[in-house]
């Protein structure tokens, strides 16, 4: 593997701007690595090699001539295939959108273009982001780079696998119930989901609108904070996006005293779930490392954690059924040629183009929103969601961050299932609209990486990056170790 690919993004930016490294060298190294590893991993659905090399040459010319450059000029990135880039296909890994061309840029893409980033390709995902393994993509299954017989997690598994294997220095994903942070844990990298409303979702294909957020994959916490600084900007086109000053999350991320001043909450409910033995052991080691550095740990009690899987299924599926209702095959997307009338055409367009997991969620969502079930299912779920939010808010009176394993299981082989409780502490962040970040902490005896998760209070993202960065420094995890593919 080319050593240039092990360079952290901040250092890449400085070396490109100073002329020590050319952007075209980095982009060529990325595509060389992709050609060597992606036939096994299958992280990318589409590559833009010719255009990327042309853009890299243009970036180098800008720097050489002293022209105005973006702050991330010439740095390559992977983009999950549910985020629009004007003039490019966006499939959401579904047959329904296989010929769809994005008519405009997503808000995050606009900001990255201003920063001078180079989009090397589209990463694989579960179809319409519905799944936790990247197996429901209609095009290919993505493998975990550390063992290609195992899943990388999902739904943003392609982005996670691409960063983990060194194909790109960072990537964008989306997170509805852990879809960035779970695969980050499985693949041994950093995965960050922002506070609800911090990053605009304009131009991202909606799954469940009260959960969805766009976030970041990277090898280090500092790289994640750097990218977030460019995309976390107020946007009136997303009605829940906060408007405010742009924040440099990378500035001041190094806080040598933070562990001596914070209280870390450990959920009492952890003991209620059967986590993999090694996860329990290594999580305990991580807690002890925090204590040794001066962090205070307190037990917090959030009884409503037990409702998280059911809450997520009911509310998420209800929102899925509403969002997918706009996919009629008439205005855009797959259109059946077998319809006898308009209603039949709607039905057949979906039946012929949507996968099993998507259909299952639409059906369940339609059921819980039905007149007979709305109050006892959907309405009750929203009430319990409020209960969960209130209990977590109360927990933050005793602590500054909630700390847990990223997942309660290690990755499974293709075709095997994760338990419904596996992502419970990740999904809670989506239900409550809170920021969360997964940081790798160790390798297990099987050679697979394991991650831990910090969850902060609403809009505590800057401090969340600080605590995650502090843990990264004491974890002992070798960020320069890459899978041998």
Swiss-Prot record:
Its EC number is 6.3.5.7. Keywords: ATP-binding, Ligase, Nucleotide-binding, Protein biosynthesis. It comes from the Bacteria. GO terms for molecular function: ATP binding; glutaminyl-tRNA synthase (glutamine-hydrolyzing) activity. The active site is at residues 80, 155, 179. It catalyses: L-glutamyl-tRNA(Gln) + L-glutamine + ATP + H2O = L-glutaminyl-tRNA(Gln) + L-glutamate + ADP + phosphate + H(+). Coiled coil: none annotated. Pfam families: Amidase. One of its GO terms (biological process) is translation. One of its GO terms (cellular component) is glutamyl-tRNA(Gln) amidotransferase complex. Heterotrimer of A, B and C subunits. Allows the formation of correctly charged Gln-tRNA(Gln) through the transamidation of misacylated Glu-tRNA(Gln) in organisms which lack glutaminyl-tRNA synthetase. The reaction takes place in the presence of glutamine and ATP through an activated gamma-phospho-Glu-tRNA(Gln). Belongs to the amidase family. GatA subfamily. This is Glutamyl-tRNA(Gln) amidotransferase subunit A. It comes from Endomicrobium trichonymphae. The gene is gatA.
